[in-house]
Amino acid sequence: MEEKKIEQDELGYQLFPERGNGDRKKQGLLSKSLFTFNHKCQVMLKIALDTSPYAKLLLDAMKHTGCTVYKDRHFSCEECDGSVSGGFDAATSEIVLCQNNIHQQSHMNRVVTHELIHAFDHCRAHVDWFNNVRHLACSEIRAANLSGDCTLANELTRFKFGVKEHHKVCVRDRALRSILAVRNVSRETAEKAVDEVFDSCFNDHEPFGRIPHSKTDAKFAHRDFQNRDRYYANL
């Protein structure tokens, strides 16, 4: 049992207590509070899936690739530790949304998009999430690059001003932080993995076909994806 716990901690499960042994009990006022958080999370999730052009494109792409996403099956609003906002559990093909750490719709939209990119990678490629840190690094680079995490507006809210090539710097930094949060590896190992795959993964824009720097970009990308899908269907 102790070996299993160590293994789960090394894979980042300590950040998602409800993913582990499930021995946390919710009682009294805490239970009511968690119900409120969960309800709000579910409402914001539905809005994200119905209205976010980023999420809508990814859902279409997943369906096109043969991995249709179902809200009740593939998303789970849960309590998380620390400041983590979400995660993709490759073992269950579920996206975890941290109901205690996501309070605004714009934040929910970004988290859903970020984790759907991981789910898309899981669907289209043979990603060895648990044993190959380079595979994880590639998906984290893509998620940071394509989800809107590193738009100029979001960088300004983090008080990061005037950074040359801020987008690339942000993508590299956030990919590195994500790896260190969920894997028990040294910073040197994580940096090496990011550096080795950065160029190829940064330039892999599927299924968007471009870096969507705004909702407008994402809407155009979604339209282009739908037109491309219709074109191939008519061949």
Swiss-Prot record:
It is an enzyme of class 3 (hydrolase). GO terms for molecular function: metal ion binding; metalloendopeptidase activity. The active site is at residue 115. Its EC number is 3.4.24.-. One of its GO terms (biological process) is proteolysis. InterPro entries: Peptidase_M76_ATP23 (IPR019165). Keywords: Hydrolase, Metal-binding, Metalloprotease, Protease. The keyword Oxidoreductase does not apply. The keyword Hydrolase applies. A divalent metal cation binds at residues 114, 118. PANTHER family: MITOCHONDRIAL INNER MEMBRANE PROTEASE, MITOCHONDRIAL INNER MEMBRANE PROTEASE ATP23 HOMOLOG. This is Mitochondrial inner membrane protease ATP23 homolog.
